Amino acid sequence: LPPKTWFTRVDESPDELFYSSPRFAEHIDKATISNLSDFYKETIREDSEVLDLMSSWISHLPNDLMLSRVSGLGMNDDELSANDKLTDWCIHNLNNEPELPYKANSFNYVLCAVSIQYLTSPIEVFQSVKAVLKDQGQVIIAMSHRLFPTKAVSVFQNINREDRVRLVMSYLELSGFEEISFFDRSPKDADPLWIVTGQNNRI
């Protein structure tokens, strides 16, 4: 397992304080958002049940993708209530409580967009993600190069792009996921987009 020192942060004050004020900003370029939406369109089946982990006011899901449920888990009620893709949401600090507040076998897909760098207990979180996913369910982790430097874990700030991807793939492997894959969907002259996926094969 990765050493705990990898997951220390400059600002170890309660995350609730940092996220208390809503941030209605796009954290990646529009071209990068478009590529992420296209990937979701290609990957997520219609009528699926989806969990948007570490969610905010925008989920990057395409408008023409019809889903039966989109649950959001995040840190700011104003942001989550402004997200018109969500059918339900909850406030939950994964760094304090890595276990997700959902029943087992609840979702076909779990998404985590440009937030993986803030998890201080990623293995525990993704073990819980695996539990709430249905058999053959997928986790989709989208990454770029931007971050809040005071809240991102130290390991993410001290390794290069290739090692960040390898690190996230190791999170999924250590959590029991299979068929772990990497996709580079970076647009030209915009923020990069690196996507890691894993599948929950129970049977």
Annotate the PLM regions:
Residues 1-45:
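Class I SAM-dependent methyltransferase Rossmann-like catalytic core
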Residues 35, 159-182:
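Short alpha-helix
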Residues 35-38, 42-101:
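Class I SAM-dependent methyltransferase SAM/SAH-binding core
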Residues 108-123:
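A short SAM/SAH-binding and catalytic strip from SAM-dependent methyltransferases
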Residues 123-138:
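A short glycine-rich, Lys/Arg-flanked "PGG" loop and its adjoining helix->strand segment in the class I
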Residues 138-169:
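Conserved class I S-adenosyl-L-methionine
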Residues 175-178, 185-203:
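Core SAM-dependent methyltransferase catalytic element
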